[in-house]
From Swiss-Prot:
4-amino-2-methyl-5-(diphosphooxymethyl)pyrimidine binds at Q34, L35, R36, R37, K38, N66, S105, K134. This is Thiamine-phosphate synthase. InterPro entries: Aldolase_TIM, ThiamineP_synth_sf, ThiamineP_synth_TenI, TMP_synthase. It holds the Pfam family TMP-TENI. 2-[(2R,5Z)-2-carboxy-4-methylthiazol-5(2H)-ylidene]ethyl phosphate binds at T131, S132, S133, G162, I182, S183. GO terms for cellular component: cytoplasm. Its EC number is 2.5.1.3. Mg(2+) binds at D67, D86. Keywords: Magnesium, Metal-binding, Thiamine biosynthesis, Transferase.
Amino acid sequence: MTIPRRLLCVITDQQSNPVELARMALEGGARMVQLRRKSASGRDLFEWAVRIQALCREYEALFIVNDRVDIALAAHADGVHLGQQDIPVASARALLGPETLIGVSVSTPSEAAKAAEEGADYLGVGHIFPTSSKEKPMPPIGTSAIRPIIEASGLPVIAIGGIELQNVAEVIKAGASGVAVISAVSGSADPVAATRELVKRIRQ
């Protein structure tokens, strides 16, 4: 399984109904949905994951679970996205098998090279711009960081962090295979339209 070029991934936020947000994102043309809800119970995550996976099948999109390998496995997700402090890629691969996508969050070429060596399929790179989605101890890395990370890893990059309609084209031009957003869609009064506009800008 591979990451399509010029992909928009919509990540669920901490407030919205994740299933409804996923439905609107898919209707707007998102090619990937990531379920991320740090405070949710395992049962809630599993129930949401099963429903979002069904929606993604309907729209022929990819479904990724953040952090939770167990939920990804139980819900037959297309992949899992791991942070630097999560279960190692090799351990996740042993549980999920060779066909499941495994993404890893990185912010430096050395982290990228390590993730590639361990068998990651793609990289989540950021945060690119200032973002309000969570507290960030480090400053944004900017679009200039994307190319060295690609060169160090040879993996497709999905950029994240402060990406919105006004700067998404800059991110794609810098070499990213796709972008991931949270508030640019979930914080919009019309998530379907917001997704559609982002997809249009990405594909220009």
